Design a protein with these regions (language model features):
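Residues at alpha-helix boundaries and the short loops/turns that link adjacent helices
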Residues: 145, 176, 215-219, 271, ...
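Short, well-ordered strand-loop elements centered on a beta-strand within folded domains, enriched
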Residues: 150, 164-168, 322-332
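An accessory alpha-helical subdomain
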Residues: 213-242, 260-276, 280-281
Length: 332
């Protein structure tokens, strides 16, 4: 335990969280650094704990190029990492325009981090999301009418099929703790102006909605939302195991897509049926179905009245005899 005389409690809390995360590292680790208080506190704790454990750690600063002077901000963040004893690199990424600005920036950021991790030889990338970020994610999901999987928030650990392990050591740590940890160590974090821009829904939740909830419902709302996410994630993971087993039995590959047994799909409870539809379409085509689209496809099995093909982004769903086919639109 970090209870040495003079060690600030906030610094100790962040270090404990990082120490636990580093236990799963078999080699070098990368730490995502924006220069803000969350990622800077994470970088400082990683520098300390990695040195103690004999683990090489390197900070990766992503320059999205979306703000004037972003290159200088990125360079300053990298210099702070080096001052902490970390290796550091700046990765400039190109943000696409096909999705919304937040989604496009996120996709570019993760791609840049994954590529840097390969160059570093790191199987683990540490991310600085806090308990507050988790609570905001749950609230945003509720406002959008999302399903249980979205309300489960961000996982503490996730591995892509071909990428690194994404680890969020600070999901049980409050944002005010990372701010205090930076102050206690004399670190000067960068304050991203986007984090104060009410044009972003997450900023409105953070600065307007959460304070009202804390005032009206009492303290502990953020912690309660984070607990809800954790419980839903446990349920979702168990549910996904059921879905995987069912899919093996009822889903087959078809030309330019997949096909699903009508009888087997209809025999499942609605929750399982709808999850199967969403999951197989997302897995095959990368399309995230709305609830209305999901139900419309399911009705091809449960309420068949000769409906025509259902247009979806990049693909279409249709009833063909005793099966539902979801195929690329060019194959129709």
């Amino acid at each position: 335990m970090d209870h040495r005389p003079g060690l600030d409690p906030s610094v100790a809390e962040v270090r404990r969280a990082v120490r636990s995360a580093l236990e799963r590292a078999d080699g070098p680790v990368a730490v995502a650094l924006s220069g803000g208080p969350d990622s800077l506190a994470l970088a400082a704790a990683t520098a300390f704990e990695a040195a103690r454990a004999g683990i090489r750690a390197e900070a990766v600063v992503i320059d999205h190029g979306l703000q004037e002077g972003s290159d200088a901000v990125a360079a300053a963040a990298a210099e702070k990492a080096r001052a902490l004893g970390l290796g550091a690199r700046v990765v400039r990424v190109e943000v696409g325009s096909t999705d919304g600005p937040e989604a496009a920036a996120r996709a570019a950021r993760y791609a840049g981090l994954a590529a840097a991790a390969v160059e570093i030889g790191a199987d683990v990338v540490l991310l600085g999301h806090t308990l507050d970020d988790q609570a905001e994610t749950v609230l945003l999901g509720l406002a959008r009418g999302s399903g249980g999987l979205s309300l489960a928030g961000m996982p503490a650990e996730r591995r892509d099929a071909t990428g690194p392990i994404w680890v969020r050591p600070l999901l049980a740590v409050r944002r005010h703790t990372t701010v205090a940890a930076c102050a206690a160590q004399g670190l000067d974090p960068w304050n991203d102006p986007h984090n104060a821009d009410p044009a972003y829904s997450r900023v409105r939740v953070r600065n307007r909605v959460m304070p009202v909830l804390e005032t009206e419902l009492g303290p502990g709302v953020a912690e309660a939302l984070a607990r809800t996410a954790e419980q839903l994630r446990e349920d979702a993971e168990a549910f996904q195991d059921m879905i995987d087993e069912t899919i093996e039995d009822i889903v087959e590959h078809a030309e330019a897509g997949i096909s699903i047994s009508v009888a087997a799909l209809a025999a499942n409870p609605a929750a399982v049926r709808n999850r199967i539809v969403r999951y197989v379409v997302d897995s095959e085509f990368g399309v995230s179905l709305s609830r209305a689209q999901t139900l419309e496809i399911a009705r091809l099995a449960t309420d068949w009245k000769g409906q025509g093909p259902i247009d979806l982004p990049g693909c279409l769903a249709r009833r063909v005899g005793a099966r539902i086919e979801v195929v690329a639109r060019t194959a129709s």
